Amino acid sequence: MTPEEVLEEFRSAGALLQGHFILSSGLRSPTFLQKMTIFSDPARTERLCRALAEVITARFGRIDIVVSPAIGGIIPGYETARHLGAKAIFVERDPGGPFTLRRGFSIPAGTRAVIVEDIVTTGLSARECLASLKDEAGEVVGAACLIDRSGGRGAIGLPLLSLVTLDIPTYAPDALPAELAAIPPVKPGSRALPKP
């Protein structure tokens, strides 16, 4: 699947949005990738994750376990693992705490794991996921995502593969360009949503 075909999947699903968005990192952006619109379509998700599995296999070879950060990474992690013939597990947060492996999940000695994310903006979730795996016996060989919107700057401490790398600008809330500041912001993501 070419980068343009990946972007067309997002465009045709109405998942490539323009406006003024508050990202889960707190940064602001004129572009938002609404991945849950993608993941609500099993056929579209299957196509994208099959392509991601092919990229992972070409770079890393055998993968035994796919680890994803909850919640956003669970669907692409599971579907990518299915195409890799691997086990799918996830890390999750205790409220206000770091990611941890729970539910009896582990990465045993001799296994090769890859972290699978949905969209990488700063790399924070992938870095936190990797940190939560430091005491596991198996080897975490790299990470992969559908779209790296950091322009390749989302360093996580491992090789990061993506189907598409975009350089989508992000801004601190106090450093917005005038044209973005003129648009009322919306927070379409899920991290730290205000309580109703």
Swiss-Prot record:
The keyword Magnesium applies. It holds the Pfam family Pribosyltran. One of its GO terms (biological process) is pyrimidine nucleobase biosynthetic process. Orotate binds at residues 121, 149. It catalyses: orotidine 5'-phosphate + diphosphate = orotate + 5-phospho-alpha-D-ribose 1-diphosphate. The keyword Nucleotide-binding does not apply. Belongs to the purine/pyrimidine phosphoribosyltransferase family. PyrE subfamily. NCBIfam families: pyrE_Therm (TIGR01367). This is Orotate phosphoribosyltransferase. It comes from Methylorubrum extorquens (strain PA1).
